[in-house]
C-alpha cells in the first residue's frame, strides 16, 4: 500500500502538470503537485495527486471530453467543491493519478497547498504524519476507508497548524 518516496513521482507529476497546463490553459489558474507523493520525506501510495485551480468549477465542463481523449477520466464531484479526474490502467483497476479540480485560492486549494508546504517545511510534522500512515496501513491493509478515516484527526490538526504557520500567527 505505502512505498518510500520515489523521485520518479516528482518527474511524472511535472510531466503531467505540463500536459494539463497545455490542455487547460484558458481555465487553469495554477496546477500543483500535492499529497504524499509531493512530500519527499514520507511514504505514499503510488498515486500522484495534483490540484488544478480554476476560477469557477463550471469552467472545466467544456474540457471533460478533451481530457478523456488524453486518458484523463472524469469521476464526478468526489467531495463538495471538488471535481475528480483520474488516470491509470482501468482494465487492471489501477489508478496512477488523482486530479482534483477546485476553486483557485479557495478553502480546498489552500488546504492542499498549506498541508504540503507545512510538512515539507517541518520534518518533525512530516515524520508524525508518516508514522500515523504506516501504522494505519498495517492495521487496515485491506480497508482503504478505515485507513483514510484514521488519518483525519491528525490531518485536521496539522491543517490548523499549517494555516497558522502560513498566516504568521
Q: Language-model segments: which ranges?
A:
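Catalytic cores of NTP-dependent nucleotidyl/adenyl transfer enzymes across multiple folds
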Residues: 107-169
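Conserved catalytic core of two-metal-ion nucleotidyltransferases
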Residues: 71-106
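Helical scaffold of the NTase/Pol beta-like nucleotidyltransferase catalytic core
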Residues: 1-32, 156
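Short amphipathic alpha-helices in soluble, non-transmembrane regions
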Residues: 62-70
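Short histidine-centered catalytic/ligand-binding loop motif
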Residues: 1-7, 52, 115-119
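Active-site nucleotide-donor binding segment shared across nucleotidyl transfer reactions
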Residues: 20-61
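Short amphipathic alpha-helical segments
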Residues: 46-50, 95-97, 115
Amino acid at each position: 500500500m505505502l512505498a518510500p518516496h520515489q523521485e520518479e513521482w516528482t518527474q511524472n507529476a511535472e510531466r503531467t502538470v505540463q500536459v494539463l497546463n497545455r490542455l487547460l490553459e484558458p481555465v487553469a489558474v495554477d496546477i500543483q503537485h500535492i499529497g504524499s507523493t509531493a512530500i519527499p520525506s514520507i511514504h505514499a501510495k503510488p498515486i500522484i495527486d495534483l490540484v488544478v485551480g480554476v476560477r469557477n468549477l463550471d469552467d472545466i465542463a467544456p474540457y471533460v471530453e478533451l481530457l478523456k481523449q488524453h486518458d484523463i477520466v472524469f469521476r464526478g464531484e468526489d467531495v463538495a467543491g471538488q471535481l475528480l479526474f483520474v488516470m491509470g490502467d482501468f482494465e487492471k483497476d489501477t489508478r496512477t493519478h488523482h486530479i482534483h479540480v477546485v476553486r483557485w485560492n479557495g478553502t480546498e486549494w489552500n488546504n492542499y497547498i498549506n498541508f504540503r508546504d507545512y510538512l515539507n517545511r517541518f520534518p518533525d510534522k512530516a515524520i508524525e504524519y508518516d508514522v500515523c500512515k504506516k501504522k494505519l496501513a498495517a492495521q487496515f491493509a485491506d480497508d482503504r476507508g478505515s485507513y483514510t478515516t484514521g488519518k483525519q484527526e491528525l490531518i485536521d490538526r496539522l491543517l490548523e497548524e499549517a494555516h497558522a504557520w502560513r498566516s504568521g500567527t
